[in-house]
Design a protein with these regions (language model features):
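Membrane-proximal alpha-helical signals and transmembrane carboxylates
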Residues: 2-374
Length: 374
């Protein structure tokens, strides 16, 4: 019986066809970054960064391999056509399976970014973990920056994005998580905003790019971005602020540096009989004092809590005002209307409903730690 079974298995193995649908890495040129730009002539500029591996000779006579970045770009009608054109310029096949970044130029992002991403979602070999960002100026220019600490510009930008995610400056967003958000009629997206530093050898995170209906419509600064993410209940490992608590006087002793130890966010959406939408947004922050040059925190504890609560509440109002000015429903108020007030949502103007939402926001601060010992 065992022999018959072995013979049967052997025959099946012999008749089983092998899979020849393979992609050999030795023939692949890995794309590390993709950029989308609009030229002054209103044409589509497609750019990529690929690794450029070279050898370094050591004094001992041995060689080590290192990698740099090579930038390629072309004018095309679509991203797929652009990739086909660039494929004719290099020996090998372009492969986006290890792509790290997708960058939009500022002018390009002012148009609808969705069509440019269509090919990425359709290609089964595309990397769904790629990060996205908007670049002030042409995105392809940022690929030509020569960073001092990292030879690969793609890895440099990726490290920067990951560190600012940890510090609650930008949200953790990938091409996969963006897919559902960008098609949601009740929510708008926000993406990191990058710029080339003044010396041309560094890249800075400027803040957040606000989108309205898949088009760039406004921005938030770095500090505003952190507060927005807390208001949106998205906190990274750290969330730090430095606030002036003495009539905006510039001296060092008038500032306090804080880190969010814990937080609680409550957002309630209500609709009255006239169909007007109101939102109560309350944020409670438990803060740790990391720097206070005046020194005596316990003595000024109540005063600091009260002053900081006023400052954060005022700044929260400014952040919400900027979101409404850009018509960017990043809080997903429309999504809550669809789910819990569907009849009211059907009557709303889907283009401008967010601008007409009445917000009541309050931030309550309590300092819970101000030294090494809690």
């Amino acid at each position: 019986m065992k022999i018959k079974r072995l013979i049967t298995i052997g025959i099946c193995l012999l008749l089983t066809t092998g899979c020849w649908d393979q992609n050999l890495m030795k023939n692949a040129i890995l794309i590390q970054t993709i950029t989308f730009d609009r030229t002054d002539e209103d044409k589509f500029l497609f750019g990529i960064a690929i690794p450029d591996i070279y050898s370094n000779a050591l004094t001992s006579g041995q060689e080590t391999q290192a990698s740099n970045s090579q930038t390629l770009s072309t004018i095309a009608n679509t991203p797929r056509e652009g990739r086909m054109k660039l494929n004719t310029e290099i020996p090998g096949n372009l492969d986006a399976s290890k792509n790290k970044l997708i960058l939009f130029g500022e002018q390009f992002a002012k148009g609808d970014i969705y069509p440019s991403l269509d090919v990425i979602w359709r290609d089964p070999r595309s990397s769904m973990s790629a990060k996205l960002a908007v670049v002030k100026g042409p995105a392809v220019d940022i690929l030509r920056v020569k960073p001092k600490l990292e030879s690969s510009i793609s890895q440099n930008i990726l490290n920067l994005i990951q560190s600012t995610e940890t510090n609650t400056i930008i949200p953790d967003e990938t091409i996969q998580s963006l897919a559902s958000e960008i098609l949601d009629p009740g929510e708008d997206i926000v993406l990191p905003l990058l710029k080339i530093g003044h010396n041309g050898t560094a890249i800075d995170v400027e803040g957040l790019a606000l989108f309205n209906d898949r088009k760039l419509a406004g921005t938030l600064s770095r500090e505003e971005s952190t507060l927005f993410l807390l208001l949106n209940n998205k906190r990274g490992k750290y969330a730090r602020f430095t606030k002036n608590i003495n009539d905006n006087k510039p001296k060092m002793i008038n500032f306090v540096s804080l880190n969010v130890d814990n937080m609680r966010r409550k957002l309630d959406v209500s609709v009255n009989n006239d169909g007007d939408v109101s939102v109560n947004l309350n944020l409670r922050l438990d803060l740790a004092v990391e720097e206070f040059p005046i020194g005596n925190v316990p003595k000024k504890l109540n005063q600091l809590n009260e002053e900081l609560s006023k400052i954060f509440t005022s700044e929260a109002g400014e952040v919400i005002h900027k979101l409404q000015e850009a018509n960017c429903d990043a809080f997903g108020i429309g999504r809550r209307l669809i789910a819990f007030h569907h009849g009211s949502w059907l009557k709303k103007d889907k283009v401008s409903y967010f601008r007409n939402v009445k917000f009541e926001s309050k931030v309550e601060v309590e300092i819970v730690r101000y030294g090494i010992v809690k």
